[in-house]
């Protein structure tokens, strides 16, 4: 069985039986899954109407989450409520910029220019969803945590040589 984000997504929808078909048809990432429609479900082999509805509804939610994700900040632990901020105060992000302010959308994308109202409250995410969001962001940004500068390989030959040359005095005991 495949072990990736699409499998976890289908498992959450209680439809893990389609995971292998999704991957075989090229739907191995949630970004790709956001494009799924009825013809795609036919090709994947999702024939049950209830399963099709569940998947299409989940795809719609994925698209909405992507549209609402621009400019959101989150915390891993809940923070105590501040003592009565003024009603006209604008929450600030990590860098002191106002959330939803001019810092959004400066990378050339149109996500910062949506007209839908957004909540300025802190959002709590379940652990799995947060892991998925972080993984997707790392993939989008081309960051590989298993490669330098984020990690380095320890040469196996060096470890073996060290163990082979372990002090002879400790072996004679």
UniProtKB/Swiss-Prot annotation:
Keyword annotations of the record: Cytoplasm
Region of interest (Disordered), ranges: 75-119
GO cellular component entries: cytoplasm
Cytoplasm keyword on record: yes
Annotated organism of origin: Homo sapiens (Human)
InterPro entries named in the record: SAM (IPR001660), SAM-SH3_domain_protein (IPR051725), SAM/pointed_sf (IPR013761)
Tissue specificity statement from the Swiss-Prot or TrEMBL entry: Detected in biliary epithelial cells on bile ducts at the hepatic hilum (at protein level).
Pfam families reported for this sequence: SAM_1
GO annotation, biological process: regulation of intracellular signal transduction
Pro residues bias (residue ranges): 79-88
Signal sequence annotation: none
Domain of life: Eukaryota
Assembly and binders: Interacts promiscuously (via SAM domain) with EPHA5, EPHA6, EPHA7, EPHA8, EPHB1, EPHB2, EPHB3 and EPHB4 (via SAM domain) (in vitro).
Keyword Amino-acid biosynthesis assigned: no
Subcellular location: Cytoplasm
Predominant localisation class: cytoplasm
The SAM domain, residue ranges: 1-65
Record-given protein name: Sterile alpha motif domain-containing protein 5
């Amino acid at each position: 069985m495949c072990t990736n984000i699409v499998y976890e997504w289908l498992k959450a929808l209680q439809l893990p039986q389609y995971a292998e078909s999704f991957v075989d048809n090229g739907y191995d990432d949630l970004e790709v899954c956001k494009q799924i429609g009825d013809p795609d479900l036919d090709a994947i082999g999702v024939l049950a109407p209830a399963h099709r509805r569940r998947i299409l509804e989940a795809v719609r939610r994925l698209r909405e989450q992507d549209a609402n994700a621009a400019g959101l900040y989150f915390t891993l632990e809940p923070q105590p409520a501040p003592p009565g901020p003024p009603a006209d105060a604008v929450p600030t992000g990590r860098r002191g910029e106002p959330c939803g302010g001019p810092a959004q959308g400066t990378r050339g994308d149109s996500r910062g220019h949506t007209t839908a109202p957004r909540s300025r409250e802190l959002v709590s995410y379940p652990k799995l969803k947060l892991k998925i969001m972080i993984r997707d962001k790392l993939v989008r940004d081309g960051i590989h945590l298993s490669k330098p500068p984020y990690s380095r390989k320890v040469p196996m030959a060096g470890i073996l040589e060290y163990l082979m040359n372990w002090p002879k005095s400790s072996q004679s005991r």
